[in-house]
């Protein structure tokens, strides 16, 4: 064997061994919670656990009280951006304005970190477990499911946008499409039948009482809509029609985002309720987790084009988010004597659901939130000092949520 062939074979061997070592270290595969060992060096004996062993520490009273604490925390986190938005609209204040911006962009960073640290990494740990090799062995299913989930959400949004275009006869994405925060202007073009005519631009930000006023520019992402043209070249000239169209687009993206977080919150509630001694550490972490995620969702609701007839919707959506984790905890307490979180079925289901949710939040966090806010929005911040502040808020949200991943 030549020296070159020997060197290539050795390099391939090192690459394979390095991959296996890193895979084991990152995924903690050798310390699988599903695998019981007699000592550190012994082979696998039994997979799964005893449902009763996860509840031997008691603290039932604290667990019941935790349901109401997390409910209150979720409500505060979700509704704080909505309240700040209303206050700033009615009485502009630079401090409240910056507090609102902090909640909005900090929440965006939280959602992105949740996708990678709190969903994708646990999904890898679960689906790579040795006890699940019969189901998921031979392929990296966790990132694969995450990738499929990203593509599914993209295709879903494309189809929904096409449906809106077909249903309302509107072209999306051209110069007549919705423009968020565009400068007020008008333009003219030749029409064979009607000659030259202009399209006005409508400011659709309104106060809670429905009376128009001058809202804080840029900071509340004041929405200005240019009328749309349909296939018959008939202009949509009413503000209510323009608002309705924009709201449908925004609400579609938000429902996709909230559905993933709700799915994740149910799992959080179940696992928190049936946790053992680690409940003391897990509980305060979940409080921060729910508050930060609530700020991220609430800030998105506050920036949407709600009209007088739909002003109640964001508050209802906020209540739905706030109830999900407490309901999951209550369900976990109800089945704690019989549910084994380390059983093959429940462990695999948690891994698959975490991977699906991570894909949705990766897409939503990068495309719908950060890319829209910093790259694609016509109203993106052009003031360098404020831009640095907004970027710092987003990175702080990501960092804090990633740090919390050490405990939950």
Swiss-Prot record:
It is found in: Endoplasmic reticulum membrane. Disulfide bonds: none annotated. The chain crosses the membrane at residues 64-84, 101-121, 141-161, 254-274, 279-299, 315-335, 351-371, 387-407. GO terms for cellular component: endoplasmic reticulum membrane; plasma membrane. GO terms for molecular function: high-affinity zinc transmembrane transporter activity; zinc ion transmembrane transporter activity. It holds the Pfam family Zip. The keyword Transport applies. Keywords: Endoplasmic reticulum, Ion transport, Membrane, Phosphoprotein, Transmembrane, Transmembrane helix, Transport, Zinc, Zinc transport. The modification Phosphothreonine is found at residues 234, 237. It is a multi-pass membrane protein. The keyword Transferase does not apply. One of its GO terms (biological process) is intracellular zinc ion homeostasis. Belongs to the ZIP transporter (TC 2.A.5) family. High-affinity zinc transport protein. Regulates intracellular zinc levels. NCBIfam families: zip (TIGR00820). This is Zinc-regulated transporter 1. The gene is zrt1.
């Amino acid at each position: 064997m030549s020296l070159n062939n020997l060197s290539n074979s050795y390099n391939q061997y090192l690459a394979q061994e390095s991959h296996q070592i890193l895979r084991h270290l990152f995924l903690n595969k050798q310390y699988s919670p599903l695998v019981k060992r007699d000592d550190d060096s012994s082979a696998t004996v039994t997979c799964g656990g005893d449902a009763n062993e996860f509840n031997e520490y008691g603290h039932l009273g604290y667990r019941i009280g935790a349901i109401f604490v997390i409910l209150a925390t979720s409500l505060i986190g979700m509704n704080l951006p909505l309240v700040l938005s209303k206050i700033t609209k009615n009485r502009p204040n630079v401090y409240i304005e910056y507090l609102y911006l902090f909640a909005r962009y900090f929440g965006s960073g939280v959602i992105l970190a949740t996708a990678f640290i709190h969903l994708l990494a646990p999904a890898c740990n679960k689906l790579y477990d040795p006890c699940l090799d019969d189901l998921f062995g031979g392929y990296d299913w966790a990132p694969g499911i995450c990738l499929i989930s990203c593509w599914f959400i993209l295709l879903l949004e494309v189809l929904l946008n096409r449906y809106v275009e077909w249903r309302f006869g509107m072209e999306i994405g051209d110069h007549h499409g919705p423009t968020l925060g565009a400068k007020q202007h008008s333009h003219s073009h030749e029409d064979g039948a009607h000659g030259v005519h202009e399209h006005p631009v409508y400011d659709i930000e309104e106060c809670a009482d429905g009376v128009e006023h001058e809202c804080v520019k840029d900071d509340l992402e004041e929405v200005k809509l240019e009328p749309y043209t349909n296939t018959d070249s008939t202009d949509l000239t009413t503000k209510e029609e323009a608002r309705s169209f924009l709201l449908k687009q925004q609400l579609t993206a938000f429902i996709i985002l909230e559905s993933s977080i709700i799915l994740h919150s149910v799992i959080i509630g179940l696992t928190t309720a049936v946790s053992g001694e680690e409940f003391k550490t897990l509980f305060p972490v979940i409080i921060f987790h729910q508050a930060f995620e609530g700020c991220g969702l609430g800030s998105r609701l506050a920036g949407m084009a709600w009209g007088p007839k739909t002003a109640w919707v964001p508050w209802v959506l906020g209540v739905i988010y706030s109830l999900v984790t407490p309901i999951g905890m209550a369900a976990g307490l109800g089945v704690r004597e019989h549910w084994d979180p380390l059983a093959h079925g429940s462990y695999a289901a948690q891994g698959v659901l975490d991977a699906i949710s991570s894909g949705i939040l990766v897409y939503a966090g990068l495309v719908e939130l950060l890319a829209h806010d910093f790259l694609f929005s016509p109203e993106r911040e052009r003031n360098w000092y404020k831009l640095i502040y907004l970027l710092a808020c987003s990175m702080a949200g990501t960092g804090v949520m990633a740090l919390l991943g050490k405990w939950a």
